[in-house]
UniProtKB/Swiss-Prot annotation:
An annotated GO cellular component: plasma membrane
UniProt family annotation: Belongs to the anion channel-forming bestrophin (TC 1.A.46) family.
This protein's UniProt keywords: Cell membrane, Ion transport, Membrane, Transmembrane, Transmembrane helix, Transport
Subcellular location: Cell membrane
Protein name as annotated: Voltage-dependent anion channel-forming protein YneE
InterPro entries in UniProt: Bestrophin-like (IPR021134), YneE/VCCN1/2-like (IPR044669)
Mode of membrane association: Multi-pass membrane protein
Length: 304
């Protein structure tokens, strides 16, 4: 995620870090070079009687803009839902620890429960990003639990099971009543709902055929555009063609980033920072001293 302070509109025009321009610059450069080639070839294909008009491109451009808008809205909805789910995880994590602390004030094993909660957040993050988990989870789980979690089809779900077992042991020993156990178990169900929601987004991409047809149409439009502009604009063709192409190609590239909100692109969710915030909150609630520093954006304003 890009976290920038409010800037003057003139400075925003020239922003590089955080924009998709760095990703699509080579494509715009190709469009610029193609436009120059079209200017050079103009006398030849005029002699052949080949003539393009802007009318079909105007109609096609409006259609592409509408469908790009639909796709971007769908991808942004995935992004918003993903952020909402991680917000729910923060609420559930704080709530269940608060209830455990107040119902079991003399419990000495709460540190283990806190580490299970932190491990769950990091495990979910690394699962969604398809990253190796053993090294990070080893900081929060004992060797036996770590082996069970890593060997599971759904490691995060296995950690939820370990948290449920921790509560069940206190219930069997009489430290938790059935009512309190049921309340705490509902919090675990909330965390399970977050897990399922994130898995649904991660495992259900925008239909490939829909993405493909838009991608093809956008690039064919941008390739043919200089031929339609050159008759009227001539030497201004490269500049106008690049400007129009930037609008369409940038929207297409932005939709690709937002489609998977759990990745590490510039405009994806800052899962590292969210997990860091959860860890800090839980450790402070448990009055621990060894607390990690809060993550801040890097020099390029990116927060991962």
């Amino acid at each position: 995620m890009i976290v920038r302070p409010q800037q003057h509109w003139i400075r925003l025009i020239f922003v590089w870090h955080g924009s998709v321009l760095s990703k699509i610059f080579s494509r715009l450069l190709l469009n610029f070079l193609l436009s120059i080639a079209v200017i050079i070839m103009l006398p030849w294909y005029t002699m052949l009687g080949i003539k393009f008009t802007l009318a079909p491109f105007s109609i096609l451009g409006v259609a592409i803009a509408i469908f790009l808008g639909f796709r971007n809205n769908a991808c942004y909805a995935r992004y918003v839902e993903a952020r909402h789910l991680w917000g729910q995880l923060m609420i559930a994590s704080r709530s269940i620890l608060r209830e455990v602390k107040t119902t079991l004030p003399d419990e000495r094993g709460i540190e283990d429960f806190v580490r299970l909660q932190i491990a769950f957040a990091h495990c979910l993050r690394m699962t969604l990003r398809r990253q190796p988990q053993t090294q990070v989870l080893g900081n929060y789980l004992d060797q036996e639990a770590l082996q069970k979690v890593v060997a599971s089809h759904s490691p995060a779900n296995r950690i939820l099971l370990l948290m449920g077992e921790w509560l069940a042991i206190r219930r069997r020993s009489g430290k938790l009543s059935d009512i309190l156990f049921h309340s705490l178990n509902n919090r675990l169900n909330d965390m399970s709902s977050v897990l399922a929601g994130c898995e649904r987004i991660a495992n259900t991409p925008v239909p490939f055929a829909y993405t493909l047809i838009l991608h093809r149409t956008v690039y064919l439009f941008c390739i043919m555009l200089p031929f339609a502009l050159v008759v009227d604009l001539h030497y201004m063709t490269p500049f106008i063609s690049v400007l129009i192409s930037y609008t369409f190609i940038a929207l297409d590239a932005l939709a690709e980033e937002l489609e998977d909100p759990f990745g590490t692109e510039n405009n994806d969710l800052p899962l590292d920072a969210i997990c860091n915030a959860i860890e800090i909150d839980l450790l402070q609630m448990n009055d621990e001293r060894d607390i990690p520093a809060k993550r801040i954006p890097d020099k390029r304003y990116q927060l991962t």
